[in-house]
Regions:
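Structural recognition of the beta-strand scaffold that forms the well-ordered cores
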Residues: 101-105, 144, 207, 215-217, ...
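Active-site-proximal beta-strand/loop segments in catalytic clefts of secreted hydrolases
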Residues: 71, 103-108, 218-221, 250-253
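Zymogen propeptides
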Residues: 30-146, 151-153
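Bacterial N-terminal signal peptides
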Residues: 13-24
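Short acidic-glycine loop/turn motifs at beta-strand connectors
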Residues: 73-76, 144-151, 183, 208-212, ...
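Conserved, well-ordered active-site substructure
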Residues: 113-137, 191-208, 213-245, 255-292
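Bacterial N-terminal signal peptides that target proteins for export
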Residues: 2-15
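Short, conserved active-site entrance elements at the starts or edges of catalytic domains
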Residues: 168-193
C-alpha cells in the first residue's frame, strides 16, 4: 500500500468513527433539547387554589406536537380514592356522582363492563375486579392511598402479591406498566408489551415527586398537528423531565380524561375523533380526589 493509500484509509477510518460518534450523541442532544423545551414552554395555569395546581401546555417535543395537562396536589390536604362501576360510565359523570373535586380515568377494563385489574375501595377488595391469580405478568404497579398517614405511594408488585402489599391502605388501584421507580425507567423489565404501547397514543398516568406531591397527568393524542400522543418510553422521559420520581401508566387511548368540578373536562379526549372536550369514553374505574 502506498503512503497516499494508507493516509486515505486512515482518513476514512477516522471519518467513520466521527460519523458513528455523531449518531450516538444526536439522540442525547435531542433529548436534552426536548427537556428544555418542555420545562421552559408557555404553561397555562388553569387553576391554582387550596393546594391544587392545574396547568397545561401545547409544545413540540419528540418531533411532534404534544398537549399535556398536569394536576398536582398535596396528599396531606386531599383524599385520593378509587371510583368503580359495574357498568361503564364517563369519568366526569362518575366523578360528579362521587362529589369529587378532580378526577382522572383509571386502569384497564373490559368493554363488557368489569375492570381487568385489582381494585380496593374504602378498605374492601372490589369483587368485580380481577383476582390476583388471573395474570402472572410482571411490572404491574399499585397506586395506594393511606388515609392514616395521608400519603400516596406507587410501588411495584407482582400481581399475586397485590392483596398483601395493599393491606395497610384503604384505596388501591393496580395498573400496567410501572413507568418510573426512584427516577429509574422500569420498561426494560416488562415481560409483555402490547403493540399499541410502542405506538403514539393518548396517555394517562399518576405520578409522585420527591416531596410526596401527587399528579394526575394526561397526554392528548390522535389529533394531527395538535396532539400526537406518546409511546411509553416518551411518556417515561416526559415524567422525568417534569420532576417525578415514581409514575404508573393508566388506561389511555380514548379513555384518557382529566376532569375538574369547576372547569369540567380540561384535556382533549379523543374517542369522538375530534380535538375538543366532548370525546369522553365510558370507563369502569377512576381515580379522584376530595379536599379534606
Amino acid at each position: 500500500m502506498t503512503n497516499r493509500n494508507a493516509i486515505t484509509a486512515k482518513l476514512r477510518a477516522v471519518l467513520l468513527l466521527v460519523v458513528l460518534a455523531i449518531m450516538q450523541v444526536q439522540p442525547v442532544f435531542a433529548s436534552d433539547k426536548d427537556s428544555i423545551t418542555l420545562v421552559n414552554a408557555n404553561w397555562q395555569t388553569l387553576y391554582d387554589e387550596d393546594g391544587v395546581q392545574l396547568k397545561s401546555v401545547n409544545c413540540h417535543i419528540f418531533n411532534a406536537s404534544q398537549n399535556i395537562t398536569v394536576l398536582t396536589f398535596n396528599a396531606r390536604e386531599f383524599s385520593m380514592q378509587v371510583g368503580v362501576s359495574d357498568t361503564l360510565i364517563e369519568t366526569s359523570r362518575m366523578a360528579e356522582s362521587l362529589n369529587a373535586d378532580f378526577a382522572i380515568n383509571g386502569s384497564f377494563f373490559d368493554f363488557a363492563g368489569p375492570a381487568l385489574t385489582f381494585i380496593k375501595k374504602h378498605g374492601r377488595i372490589h369483587p368485580g375486579g380481577a383476582s390476583p391469580e388471573q395474570t402472572s405478568r410482571n411490572n404491574w404497579g399499585l397506586v395506594m392511598a393511606d388515609s392514616n398517614s395521608r400519603s400516596v405511594k406507587i410501588i411495584p408488585s407482582a400481581y399475586v402479591d397485590m392483596p398483601e402489599k395493599s393491606s395497610a391502605c384503604d384505596n388501591v388501584l393496580a395498573s400496567y406498566p410501572l413507568l418510573l421507580q426512584g427516577k429509574t425507567i422500569c420498561l426494560d423489565s416488562c415481560d409483555y408489551v402490547p403493540n399499541n404501547f410502542n405506538n403514539r397514543n393518548p396517555r394517562s398516568l399518576v405520578a409522585i415527586d420527591s416531596s410526596g406531591n401527587v399528579a394526575f397527568v394526561t397526554i392528548d393524542g390522535r389529533a394531527e398537528g395538535k396532539a400526537m400522543g406518546m409511546t411509553l418510553y416518551e411518556e417515561c422521559k416526559m415524567a422525568l423531565w417534569l420532576g417525578f420520581t415514581d409514575a404508573l401508566n393508566l388506561d389511555g387511548g380514548g379513555s384518557t380524561t382529566l376532569w375538574s368540578r369547576t372547569l369540567g373536562i380540561v384535556n382533549y379526549p379523543s374517542d369522538n375523533k375530534k380535538f375538543d372536550h366532548e370525546g369522553e369514553r365510558k370507563v369502569s374505574n377512576i381515580l379522584y380526589i376530595k379536599h379534606l
